[in-house]
Amino acid sequence: MESYHKPDQQKLQALKDTANRLRISSIQATTAAGSGHPTSCCSAAEIMAVLFFHTMRYKSQDPRNPHNDRFVLSKGHAAPILYAVWAEAGFLAEAELLNLRKISSDLDGHPVPKQAFTDVATGSLGQGLGAACGMAYTGKYFDKASYRVYCLLGDGELSEGSVWEAMAFASIYKLDNLVAILDINRLGQSDPAPLQHQMDIYQKRCEAFGWHAIIVDGHSVEELCKAFGQAKHQPTAIIAKTFKGRGITGVEDKESWHGKPLPKNMAEQIIQEIYSQIQSKKKILATPPQEDAPSVDIANIRMPSLPSYKVGDKIATRKAYGQALAKLGHASDRIIALDGDTKNSTFSEIFKKEHPDRFIECYIAEQNMVSIAVGCATRNRTVPFCSTFAAFFTRAFDQIRMAAISESNINLCGSHCGVSIGEDGPSQMALEDLAMFRSVPTSTVFYPSDGVATEKAVELAANTKGICFIRTSRPENAIIYNNNEDFQVGQAKVVLKSKDDQVTVIGAGVTLHEALAAAELLKKEKINIRVLDPFTIKPLDRKLILDSARATKGRILTVEDHYYEGGIGEAVSSAVVGEPGITVTHLAVNRVPRSGKPAELLKMFGIDRDAIAQAVRGLITKA
């Protein structure tokens, strides 16, 4: 970064005037909406003015230009001042600000990416810095470009552990292109923030996490200009002492005003007071960026060759995932992998070995890992694949939920699903993950049952919009598909069929192989079953399931290494509900499990081949 050059008095006054216009716009918009957070906006007015009209480099009419500096408003409830900034910059019409929070407007109560100037949705506090870290990592290590990343946080969200996961990450990877601005306005939503204005403690905490930390008067444009101009070979935290509701007489630094717009008469009076302080209506033009970000194309990334498995050979789908991802990495240098210190279990270590510069170790911080991936994926710069035990993704559910709201394209691979992992016990067993991922808007849920299907799932996920989840298993199972088998999202496979099938059995992963073993047992009794592999649990192949059910006297049996709630059984039941003559019977894990050998646990919880065979017999006997 350039060394600091103090702005002249004319520029400093122009920044003060800009800050006050931003205050006025925030008050007007929230009063017109009848809701919103004007006091949270007013504490950040000088910060936003200096950032956007002195420090940042961007094209004001092209907010998502890849060369632009990035900005993340982690304290998303201050959205009105972000909108005011883009009106001040000339991208939004001033009149549009008065449509804040209306159903007809794109100016939601918190930032969302239908706004061209918003890369990631915020509002669930504590997540913005992680996304900013992903952007900064991408800028420094993948794009090798000069754009910088700025993230504005509130002091309330500094109680979130995910913030400190991100602080640690930025320090470990020396993200000297990242600046976090802490808006220390003293007051939270219902009470003062725990440290209030103990600025030295904030500084010590940031420094302890390896950041260069600068305390400033957050309402002094001169101090802010100087702080933003201080370059260090480490991430920088600007700790700004501010006052909530700054400039609003009778409200500034007062409790009980969070999330409350000013009444109309009061707003008019306050606006007049603030307006009287503005010396010039002249607006400051944005400074254009240095154009050195490379062109990137992540469309239609394909495997360089077909799978190379042999039918009957055994491999765990978790290992097949690692091999597939490493292989796909040769097709595009924008495929990246992230892991939460489980790479020797998820087998993402294979990717690391072949593409070390594109592997990001996120350590045991799953929430931050998801946020990093979201940041890396912004502006279509990379195609991220995150991996950890599927059980540990449940810790990051809010980040995953917000990724969907962010319209992010990220891929998550969860290994060690179900009781079939064996001796490690219930804390490591993912038994809720299908329910979680199925509930996420924009999600696609892959559940491959062999190495070939896993490789195809990885390739499809890389080219599928939204949140993709790939569920992989620990046990080794046989390859059942030929290498040239075609797989598509939403298309199931009939793995076993005959003209005399009496029950359609649907399983995935380990339970698909148990279903095939059950078919062999039943064949000795002259009972034939049709076995379906759904491949994707969301979307589900409703047509094939219905056709198969009708061909087997309307009988469907689902079997899954997952709890009853929200898994394959409920997905299938939802797909066929209302269809006459069709019944669905479920086999699933019905209680908290325990340690044991995989085969023992499958038997204990009634999802092994014997349980499937017994259930089939029962269905036939009922007829």
UniProtKB/Swiss-Prot annotation:
Gene Ontology MF: a single term: transketolase activity
Keyword annotations from UniProtKB, A to Z: Acetylation, Calcium, Disease variant, Dwarfism, Isopeptide bond, Magnesium, Metal-binding, Phosphoprotein, Thiamine pyrophosphate, Transferase, Ubl conjugation
Residues bearing the modification N6-acetyllysine: 6, 11, 144, 204, 232, 241, 260, 538, 603
Modification type N-acetylmethionine: residues: 1
Binding, thiamine diphosphate: 40, 77, 123-125, 156, 185, 244, 258, 392, 428
Positions annotated as active site in the UniProt record: 366 (proton donor)
EC code: 2.2.1.1
Cofactors demanded by this protein: Mg(2+); Ca(2+); Mn(2+); Co(2+)
Modified residues (Phosphoserine): 3, 104, 295, 345
GO terms under cellular component: cytosol; endoplasmic reticulum membrane; extracellular exosome; nuclear body; nucleoplasm; peroxisome; vesicle
Record-listed Mg(2+) binding positions: 155, 185, 187
Residues that bind substrate: 37, 258, 318, 345, 416, 424, 474
Enzyme class label: transferase
GO biological process terms on file: glyceraldehyde-3-phosphate biosynthetic process; pentose-phosphate shunt; pentose-phosphate shunt, non-oxidative branch; regulation of growth; xylulose 5-phosphate biosynthetic process
Keyword Aminoacyl-tRNA synthetase attributed: no
Modified residues (Phosphotyrosine): 275
Impact after mutating residue 318 to C: In SDDHD; decreased of transketolase activity
Catalytic activity: D-sedoheptulose 7-phosphate + D-glyceraldehyde 3-phosphate = aldehydo-D-ribose 5-phosphate + D-xylulose 5-phosphate
Residue numbers marked as site, Important for catalytic activity: 37, 258
InterPro entries cross-referenced by the UniProt entry: THDP-binding, Transketo_C/PFOR_II, Transketolase-like, Transketolase-like_Pyr-bd, Transketolase_BS, Transketolase_C, Transketolase_CS, Transketolase_N
SMART domains: Transket_pyr
Function statement: Catalyzes the transfer of a two-carbon ketol group from a ketose donor to an aldose acceptor, via a covalent intermediate with the cofactor thiamine pyrophosphate.
Family the UniProt entry places it in: Belongs to the transketolase family.
Subunit structure: Homodimer.
UniProt cross-references to PANTHER family, sorted A to Z: TRANSKETOLASE
Annotated protein name in UniProt: Transketolase
